[in-house]
Regions:
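Acidic, metal-coordinating helix/loop segments flanking the phosphotransfer/catalytic sites
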Residues: 30-48
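Hydrophobic/aromatic residues positioned on beta-strands within the core alpha/beta folds
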Residues: 79-80
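Alpha4 helix (beta4-alpha4-beta5 surface) of REC/receiver domains from two-component response regulators
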Residues: 62, 83-101, 108-112
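Active-site residues of response regulator receiver
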Residues: 52
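Two-component/phosphorelay signaling modules centered on CheY-like receiver
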Residues: 11-29, 95
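Acidic catalytic/metal-coordinating carboxylates
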Residues: 32-33, 59-62
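Short amphipathic alpha-helix used as the core "switch/output" element in two-component signaling
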Residues: 39, 61-72
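Receiver (REC) domain active-site loop signature in two-component systems and cognate sites
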Residues: 55
């Protein structure tokens, strides 16, 4: 079973996303901050991280950059209520981001994107 870490400072978002992914057949590891995400990654590698951008303390941008600096072999998808331009999205994809999901998301869209990324 493939492991996905869901990182968001909003527990309701983590719980909802976890439920959707578990129904889809994935094992989910929750994290509620950027710091917790990096700590858990050291102990338990995952195939994918669904990462909120705007969090108190260490932001999703900071976490993404740390993952790249440490050469951690995992895919990262940003989740955010903020819309980004296609140009900015392409820059992020070129830097190693796997995708970008707008919140609130449709559960089928989320599962389809995750399935495509992890196939």
């Amino acid at each position: 079973m493939k492991k996905i870490m869901v990182v968001d400072n909003e527990p309701d978002i983590v719980d909802l996303t976890r439920t959707v992914l578990e129904i889809g057949g994935y094992e989910v590891i929750p994290a509620y901050s950027g710091e917790e995400c990096l700590e858990k990654l050291e102990q338990e590698p995952v195939e994918l991280i669904l990462l909120d951008i705007m969090m108190p303390g260490m932001s999703g941008w900071d976490v993404f950059n740390r993952i790249k600096q440490k050469n951690i072999d995992t895919k990262v998808v940003f989740m955010s209520v903020l819309e980004i331009s296609e140009k900015r999205k392409q820059i992020l994809l070129d830097e190693g981001l796997s995708d970008y999901i707008m919140k609130p998301y449709d559960k089928d869209t989320l599962l389809d994107k995750v399935d495509q990324i992890l196939k």
